[in-house]
Amino acid sequence: MSTEPEGVESDSNADFAINASSFDYGMAHTSETLADPMSFQAQDLVVNLTGVERKVFVSARDDKDSLCNGVDFDADSDLLKNKDKKGFSKENLKLFDSDLVWAKLRSYPWWPGLVFDKSVASKAAMRHFKKGNVLVAYFGDCTFAWNNASQIKPFHQNFSQMQEQSNSAEFRDAIDCALDEVSRRVEFGLSCSCVSEEAYNKLKTQNIINAGIREDSSVRYGGDKLSDGISFEPAKLVDYMKHLACFPCYDATEKLQFVINRAQVLAFQQWKDYSHFIDYETFVRSVESAATLASLPEVNMDEGISAKKRKTDYKDNAEQTKEKTLSDLTVKKRCGSRSTEKLDGKSHSEKKRKVESSESGKSEKRIKKSQQKEDSVSKHSNEESLLSVGDTNKLQKTAEPCHGTGVENEMNSLTPTLKPCRASKSTEVENEKTKKPRHQELAERKISSPDEMLSSLHAANTSTGIPDSINIDPSNYEDFEKFINELFCSKLNGDSKKASITETSEPCDKKDSAEEEILPANKEITGSGSKEQIGLKDCSADSLPPYALVLNFADSGSVPSEEKLNEIFKRYGPLHESKTKVTMKGKRAKVVFKRGEDAKTAFSSAGKYSIFGPSLLSYRLEYVCPKRKKTT
């Protein structure tokens, strides 16, 4: 790693050199001279690793007017002298072949790249050669330049400052590629001969496709001095992992340290020869995504959710045009599977529709099952009745593993001991008179308290410096979840009872079979005809009471008419069309279903009626209190 003096951030004499004939796509990989891998011992642990060969699709930009100042990078160079087995060194510059650096170009920010000897320069690069400058191959595309010492800075020491220069897609992509190379070097530096030959070769080899590097020199081997076993500090890694477990986020300026620590953990995992190595990496990437989402500014619901906020730091029209054209190549230039995941509004919306579509089918199955089996309750329906559009987004992250989606399979294989969501979708509700007090029932079940459950989740942080596997009894979470569901149902009935009218009456005649299903389930009828306590139907009954679907819109102009609402929602089941109400002032619409099952199906399928577009802010289910009659 170079330790050059700070350069001046003025426009350099180095111009951008390119392949002037074509756009080339390929793997833009960093490389380095072969450094003898070292086995190391830290707390009696020998760390090995495997890695995946990282790729990025890049392009060489055509610029016939650009001029390049050359650099003499051989043994007689004024900058680099005394070539040895590990690379090049210089008394003043201390620059090594394949070092990671930041280099400055006119009209561009400081850009991450690799320094190379002129002996590997391509014909196109040698046409711009000038003695005294260094050949730099840039990350993110196939471009290169000849830079002098004042236009080069060490990568690690200046990362926090340099990464804040721009939010353009190509700049962020170049940084991701550089970080990917840092990760590879760290993993390679912690490797030893005990790993498989195939895995070891993937780690030590880098393939470079750059307009300034000859094809026969595109394969590079090894690591660097900053990434070997000597620089590894196990105690600091364990402290970092403990902190990350408690606070799973990090500042953008700390991303380099995060990548280094992650690579060290991956190396240790490979030494342990875990069969689900890729699953662990997926888990690490999910932490990166969580940190990215947590740092996003809040946006209005009608504008959608955007996890990628882009800013343009360059104001001249030429550079803005360049950014637009290269942004189309961003997807092709990603540096491999370890890049941070990014969500945009469209993909998030499509995922939401997919989840809600699958939930709709499951909802119908649960309805049929509830009609055949008494005393069963759908926990999912109760939870959904309180969700708005924003809450549904949260449901994707927290509830998907509970409903058998693709995320469940991935997370189950990822952390097989963490499965608090395996509780059954319906729970048996006992009769009010025969129920035991909840605290007695919990004591009999020996359910752990929330504090105990939380402490068990943190049990992996041991004093030995190595995270242990987390052993959690899933039955505790099943019983705890069942208890929460029953409390939720009881609270729902209790709140509804407050809004209902308690009066002295006897069983009443209903107009149709649908209303017969709405008979209060918790009536206590005495033979002498004394007072009957009229309550609401318990949530464990075999048929759901009528519900209204309430829709909230962004503005009054987007609220559809009552006829339009009836036409849209009658496909889910019979409606009380006369009760469909539209409040323009409140920007609200209400559709009343005759059967609760139909309302639930419509609610679960809310993502399908995209006819409302972004004007639909939220939707929820509202219980409709049935009318009561006195009979003799």
UniProtKB/Swiss-Prot annotation:
Residue segments, region Disordered: 310-452
Described function: May influence gene expression by regulating the function of the PRC2 complex and modulating H3K27me3 level.
Superkingdom field: Eukaryota
Family matches, as Pfam families: PWWP (PF00855)
GO biological process, one term: regulation of DNA-templated transcription
Source species: Arabidopsis thaliana (Mouse-ear cress)
Designated gene of the protein: PDP5
Name of the protein described by the UniProt record: PWWP domain-containing protein 5
Effect of inactivating the gene: No visible flowering phenotype.
GO CC annotations on file: ESC/E(Z) complex
